[in-house]
């Protein structure tokens, strides 16, 4: 989808596969994770070019993806979803599309690869694997794109699913705090990146909250995506707006402009 908040106009292109993420490319067009492939999409011509295919022989697909401050794309895969998500097999991986257009595997044995964010000073990377219900923090070297010193930053394993849900997509505000979409809990929760403790939550008329980012002319509006995938008939009766895009105003915080892919679009 391409949505203009001023006019309310929404355009869309239907691709051949499940779309996990989309990021702009500096050289034009968009990079998207579609099924197990990274593709380049030219919006005007609707031309789709496959750049890479991953996880050969596995039933996986790309899920969340985002660019680091240097313009690399970090994107991960997930296996087939199960009703009991914490029991899913860890057959996904986290990949990095480097500036020369090459793709490397960074982390393996991932359940549901999800939210990504980088601190304002560029020295820390945050990463969510939804299956264990955890967010991790890594030291990040922007010059090389290497990560290290993994620690568990937020751990919701064992906590109430209706209250805490599964951590999904995320973003950071300019105060350095993390806003995390929580699947199954109806909430986006703001966490302190100093203590890992929740500071604030925003509740929605939907249970499957998938991701969030700041937008608007002042980057002070929080856009929140939700899902209706595999929602029961009873759930849809209670929360008919599941699957909608929401916009939240008046939070009193701002976000950062989204990074774009700065690298090569050459097919490898």
Where are these regions (language model features)?
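Loop/turn-rich, solvent-exposed surfaces of beta-rich toroidal or solenoidal domains
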Residues: 133-134, 138, 155-197
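A short loop-to-beta-strand structural motif that recurs across blades of beta-propeller domains
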Residues: 1, 37-39, 92-95, 134-136, ...
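Beta-propeller domains
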Residues: 1-15, 35-39
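Blade-level signature of beta-propeller repeat domains, shared across WD40, Kelch, NHL, RCC1
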Residues: 213-268
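A short beta-strand motif characteristic of beta-propeller blades
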Residues: 7-14, 48-55, 101-108, 150-161, ...
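Beta-rich, blade/repeat-based domains predominating
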Residues: 16-31, 56-72, 91, 104-124, ...
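Conserved beta-strand positions in repeat-built beta-propeller and related beta-rich domains
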Residues: 25, 30-36, 73-85, 125-132, ...
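Short loop/turn segments immediately following beta-strands, especially the blade-tip
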Residues: 83, 138-146, 193-195, 249-255
């Amino acid at each position: 989808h391409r949505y203009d908040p001023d006019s309310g106009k929404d355009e869309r292109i239907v691709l051949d596969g499940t779309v996990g993420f989309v990021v702009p490319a500096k050289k034009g067009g968009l990079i998207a994770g579609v099924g197990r492939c990274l593709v380049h999409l030219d919006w005007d011509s609707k031309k789709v070019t496959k750049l890479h295919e991953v996880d050969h022989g596995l039933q996986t697909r790309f899920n969340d993806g985002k660019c680091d401050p240097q313009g690399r794309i970090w994107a991960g895969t997930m296996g087939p979803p199960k009703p009991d998500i914490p029991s899913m097999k860890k057959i996904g991986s986290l990949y990095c599309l480097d500036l020369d257009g090459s793709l490397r595997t960074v982390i393996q044995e991932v359940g549901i690869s999800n939210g990504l964010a980088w601190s304002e000073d560029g020295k820390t990377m945050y990463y969510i694997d939804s299956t264990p219900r955890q967010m991790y923090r890594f030291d990040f070297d922007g010059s090389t794109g290497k990560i290290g010193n993994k620690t568990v930053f937020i751990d919701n394993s064992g906590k109430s699913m209706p209250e805490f849900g599964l951590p999904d997509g995320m973003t950071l505000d300019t105060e350095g705090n993390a806003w995390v979409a929580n699947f199954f809990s109806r909430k986006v929760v703001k966490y302190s990146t100093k203590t890992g403790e929740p500071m604030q939550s925003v509740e929605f008329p939907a249970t499957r909250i998938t991701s969030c980012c700041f937008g608007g002319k002042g980057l002070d509006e929080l856009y929140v995506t939700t899902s209706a995938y595999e929602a029961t008939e009873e759930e849809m009766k209670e929360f008919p707006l599941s699957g909608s895009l929401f916009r939240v105003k008046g939070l009193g915080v701002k976000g950062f402009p989204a990074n774009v892919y700065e690298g090569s679009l050459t097919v490898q």
